[in-house]
């Protein structure tokens, strides 16, 4: 009798190509040009589609980044975490009409809604723009059965003060920034940034998984972000 794949195995089968696609593109762009600026054309377009609140949110985002690049790291972490956590949670079906859509930070802020991956991605790019080294940031797919027993998949951002340190978790569900050691409710599966992809068991060794795969979801996101900046 054929065994049904476990949830973790389904993560590996369905999401691994997506993670690998994230190793390319916009993360490198932001790391090289951290002075984030949005054109008036992008802001006007968002305002026409989503109303005047879109302009307010986008300008608040760029101002927050511009005003705080020289602040201490702990303060910048809290600023980015709090800024995106104030955006309402909205499912991809409700917001975009599809089951899985990775919104750009501009799209999330303009539409005033997003789900777990949008929070993590928005914080990641914001911290890059605030001057954080890419190698200290990881976007993490985790299982969070205590938060949602039915759909356990969740995404958070982690920050490593030092390469071998216990990371801090930036989450939209538990909004206080805590060390990962204080978040036993999260079961790590994968982590990635613009430089590599790590399975949970590989993180301690510092070894990145190797692949050059790309998929359309990230390619489309990268294309949209290129038009926004």
Q: Which functions belong to the PLM regions below?
A:
Residues 1-9:
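N-terminal secretory signal peptides that target proteins for export/translocation
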Residues 11-13, 124:
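Hydrophobic alpha-helical segments, especially transmembrane helices
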Residues 14-25:
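Bacterial N-terminal signal peptides
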Residues 26-229:
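A structural boundary/capping signal
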